[in-house]
């Protein structure tokens, strides 16, 4: 590793208010499907779920906050969401 390379910050677990942002196609029921998938893996703070549509209405961003317990949990959430076919990105 050179001096100019930057390491990703290490996440310390558990994180009780870990933000997850999901960018997906806009579609009926997609928000509920996203929440159901995440709830299979983590507790969600239901009071902190936010939904926004893109200016043209093609995409929807869902931001929610979870209790993150480990890296495997985050990987599994990401993998299952991406496998839906309508989720484009998980941040």
From Swiss-Prot:
- Domain of life per record: Bacteria
Residue span of the signal peptide, if any?
none
Cite the Pfam families for this sequence.
DUF493
Which InterPro entries does the entry mention?
UPF0250_YbeD-like, YbeD-like_sf
**GO cellular component terms attached to this protein's record:** cytosol
The entry assigns this protein to a family as follows: Belongs to the UPF0250 family.
Q: Which NCBIfam families would you find in this protein's record?
A: PRK00341.1 (NF001486)
Q: What is this protein called?
A: UPF0250 protein Pfl01_4965
């Amino acid at each position: 590793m050179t001096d100019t390379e930057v390491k990703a910050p290490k996440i310390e677990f558990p994180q009780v208010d870990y933000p997850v942002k999901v960018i997906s196609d806009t579609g009926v029921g997609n928000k509920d499907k996203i929440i159901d998938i995440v709830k299979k893996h983590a507790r969600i703070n239901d009071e902190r779920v936010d939904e926004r549509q893109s200016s043209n209405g093609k995409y929807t961003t869902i931001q929610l906050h979870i209790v993150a317990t480990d890296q495997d949990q985050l990987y599994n959430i990401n993998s299952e969401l991406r496998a839906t076919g309508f989720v484009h990105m998980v941040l």
